[in-house]
Regions:
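ATP-binding/phosphotransfer module of carbohydrate and carboxylate kinases, centering on a glycine-rich
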Residues: 1-65, 90, 111-118, 160-313
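Short glycine-rich anion-binding loops that position phosphate/pyrophosphate groups of nucleotides
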Residues: 11, 73-75, 124-127
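Short gly/pro/ser/thr-enriched loop/turn and capping motifs at secondary-structure boundaries
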Residues: 107, 127-128, 283-285
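Glycine-rich phosphate-binding loop of actin/hexokinase-like ATP-binding domains
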Residues: 115-166, 170
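Short beta-strand-loop/turn "lid" adjacent to the catalytic site in phosphate-handling enzymes
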Residues: 52-92, 97-99, 109-112
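Conserved phosphate-binding catalytic cores of ATP/NTP-utilizing and phosphoryl-transfer enzymes
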Residues: 96-119, 135
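Short, acidic/small-residue loops that bind anionic groups at enzyme active sites
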Residues: 92-103, 147, 278
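Active-site glycine-centered loops adjacent to acidic/histidine catalytic or metal-binding residues
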Residues: 7, 103, 123
Length: 313
């Protein structure tokens, strides 16, 4: 069998062709394919170009997928998943098993290949997805205006607000003021227009400022970091209440999880009932796992080992 996995996000589209044993036969990467950030026509065009590169030089059965799963950022919104699936079906009308869905599904399966579990995303934004009884439910992740608690944006906003409050005399003095201003190269009160123009990504850039000062012991930075960690932990605990497992397995995805201090704060807020699992394979492995299941193939530890050993970097 030829089993295809596709993972598409804001920076790239990753695609693999594998056999049923998990051996990676082909891998290629294309441009970004986040349907929430780009018109659907661009996303579909990127998928087509990526697939053409993936299959270049192949013919016959080698170029004919038996199953495809495409996990694409933003595919869980509206009819995006249906449109992506229809596009793939038009490209491969003979393929019996094609599905598309949010990239949270394959990100989860890259860390927890089977069974119920949850995934906690903490990057510029945040959100928790829980997979239980064959269904996936979203908790949080409603964007920086209405949610994204515990995200890079949330942490960065807390750092900048603390610096502004200290400058105004409305809040305690804090090392965050000097740290933010060092990053800005000017007083924070003179950078307001710059920060608004930069949008959520610019604000999220100050997350590491908050975490660095918290790790160094600044009292206000510690308090703000703990508050943000508690918010994200609350979303994870809401997911945990749907899981009948012990400990409750939670896959962690996003750059903030790479910060040991912040990760430890979240683990402290959760307690021993939760096990945070950092994926050691890219999300496209989860796409393969889902597609393999669609095709009736068994995914075992040996399958994972074969994928890991044959994955081109």
């Amino acid at each position: 069998m030829r089993i295809w996995g596709i993972d598409g996000g804001g920076t790239k589209t990753d695609a693999v062709i594998c056999d049923e044993g998990g051996r990676v036969l082909r891998r290629t990467q294309g441009g970004p394919s986040n349907c929430s950030a780009r018109p659907m026509e661009q996303v579909l065009s990127t998928l087509t170009k990526t697939i053409r590169t993936l299959t270049a030089g192949l013919s016959g059965a080698d170029a004919a997928p038996d199953a495809i799963f495409a996990g694409i950022s933003g595919a869980g919104v509206g009819d995006n998943a249906a449109r992506i699936r229809a596009h793939l079906q038009a490209l491969f009308p003979q393929c019996p098993c094609i599905q598309a869905g949010t990239d949270a599904k394959n990100a989860l399966r890259s860390a927890i290949p089977a069974g119920d579990g949850a995934i906690a995303i903490a990057g510029t934004g945040s959100g928790v997805f829980v997979f239980c009884g064959g269904e996936m439910q979203q908790i949080g992740g409603w964007g920086y205006l209405l949610g994204d608690e515990g995200s890079g944006f949330d942490l960065g906003r807390r750092a900048l607000k603390s610096a502004l409050r200290a400058r105004d005399g409305r809040g305690p003095q804090t090392a965050l003021t000097a740290a933010c201003e060092q990053r800005l190269g000017k007083p924070v009160t003179q950078a307001i227009a710059q920060l608004y123009q930069g949008g959520s990504a610019a604000i999220a850039g100050f997350a590491q400022v908050l975490l660095q000062e918290a790790a160094a012991g600044d009292a206000l930075a510690v308090a703000e970091a703990r508050a943000a960690a508690a918010e994200l932990a609350g979303g994870i605990q809401a997911a945990g209440r749907m899981l009948d497992t012990s400990p409750k397995a939670v896959a962690t995805v996003g750059g903030l999880w790479q910060n040991p201090f912040y990760r430890s704060l979240i683990q402290q807020a959760l307690g021993a009932a939760y096990r945070l699992i950092a994926p050691t394979l890219p999300p496209v492995y989860g796409s393969f796992v889902i597609a393999a299941g669609m095709a009736g193939a068994t995914v075992s530890p040996e399958t994972e080992a074969a994928f890991r050993a044959s994955l081109p970097m």
